[in-house]
């Protein structure tokens, strides 16, 4: 049990990369990454640890100069000075040179530098911000991970306490080359595995005493309203709670289905599977297995030393391999055989066990993940963050946040900054979990954030007033929620490819802006803005709409380039900061010129778990671009053997030529034929011709003037065919400023004559700057000048 078939461990560093004395050992991993050890007994550790699994990197060129009891070590990216003896800030330092950091960076042992932050164990009871643990990225150019106190893994994959004391740290000296640092962190600690496809759809979760009938009715209502969900999460009321005899303690921990609510659990879960939903079930395991549990006799028999006559409880001893193997075999596996797909490990009881330094949360995450993969399926866990290396066990559960605007405002930054410690698949309680207050716009903006987050899981408490069903909100709010939940599933082809990219290229779905633009000071100040895969820059709305304007204000930085709004089709010039104003129907999602985004309309039920027959490809004009669509079986670990299908797409903007190349690879994994619609966004209307390899492809074209979208529909075509679409005269559209401003003013709750006066200013034959000056002089309602100015100056 607990075999690791997902990662390769090579924990022993190369001898030729090692500098060793009686009490010290330095191991070069890359020209920028070095392991530093010091032990008085001279016994150094070569086994994998809870954090570090691989130390066998490529050979590194270096030179060394002996200096008394120490030495100076040089690579082309760093200079280490060690005076000998125990590590102190006076005896050990490192100077990072080269790379993207023009002035170098000095690190002294024990100093933390200007760390950019990592993530936190949980957002439980957080209202707004919380303190983050450190990540690997630092504006000072150097950072460290301290592995001195983590446990090691023996040859059987079980944890062992290190013997003796010592220092075991890894220093990252990458300057501001954050992408390279993150890549080597994953090489050191293990890759982020791919998620199964269903995990990227919408999750429904609520702490609520559902019954089989009420849950089926809920799912049926979702289907009727055409609201797609791919995961159903059952909180703790699936098991006996209030029914537990007080002599056994509370019902917080439980493993026995409440037959009053779910008379036939297997029937219920089969029904959910038939309706395209996977099932995750909540566990609070700390209370152990008590005599009232159905699994108690089998567990007691397996362990063999339980006083069942006196109903002795079986303590939850995560430090015992015998207990843990029995726990999975006797308690969890029978429920998985009934239909549970993965477990929600809701551990809230701290980090203390019988073994010093052993965090039970890490143990739960590690062994749950390995066990979930035992039959060759792609595993999944759902649990809190347990320190560096936790990215190996997706998905992260961030805990019970408070329902406030302050909590929403913190989550974009919290999510993107977690990439600084490689933790790339956070799942938040979208809409907030508890307390707080009712605010319909807040609920909507949270859903919009969720759709452009790693995982989109709606969740709330038992409070009868806190339901997240879209029909619980006013129609204008609920309908937009539905649109966004559908959009999440429409984006699954793009998201699944980004899922593969995270695994293959060590690049998380969400990155802070300073990863791509490390030399830009402003990239460090737009904390709620992030890159969302290869195509988008996202700046979620986290403030209430400006009264009177009817739109919410969000501060956005656009790097150099051209951008096209995902929702409105407006074209923007980059290399500037600006305030953007969005009504309830959208948030700032800016596609980069040349971006290619595969989407689908096959989004309901079991459609979400398979590769679609009908594809919509969004192509954003203004620059060349390329995309490689990744597809596989969506649920096994065959991706580790590169069993997949790749479909290349590319745009040559100057000639208007867009090509969908032949699909290549395991073609039996995708439909034999596909129907394509290619949408060119941000373009003027023009002719479009279609060529299909040996198929005589015919196509239809239509143009949406309001969105600047030219759609070319190609009928059913073999997946092995090449499709070439050529635009007659490719050119970016000119924004229809007058119509956009009219639509803004038409909905604004301001005096009618003020609206007329603003439109008159727009009609004047004067510069945009002069128009804004005259508009400001009118002293209109707050936000009107900014909202009009955004449209007026979108293209500079």
Residue ranges and their predicted role:
Residues 4, 29-68:
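A low-complexity, Ser/Thr/Gly/Pro-enriched, surface-exposed linker/loop concept
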Residues 26, 34-36, 73-80, 537-540, ...:
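Short, well-ordered beta-strand segments enriched in hydrophobic/aromatic residues
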Residues 47-61, 564-584, 688-713:
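Solvent-exposed beta-strand/loop surfaces of large extracellular or lumenal domains
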Residues 51, 82-114, 601-609, 730-772:
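Glycine/proline-rich low-complexity spacer/linker segments in large multi-domain proteins
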Residues 63-199, 206-207, 212, 219-224, ...:
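Catalytic and substrate-binding clefts that recognize carbohydrates or anionic sugar/phosphate headgroups
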Residues 103, 107-109, 228-481, 516-518, ...:
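Aromatic- and carboxylate-enriched substrate-binding clefts and catalytic-loop regions
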Residues 125, 195, 199, 205-242, ...:
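A conserved hydrophobic secondary-structure block that centers on an alpha-helix together
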Residues 369, 389-396, 410-414, 418-428, ...:
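Catalytic core of carbohydrate-active enzymes
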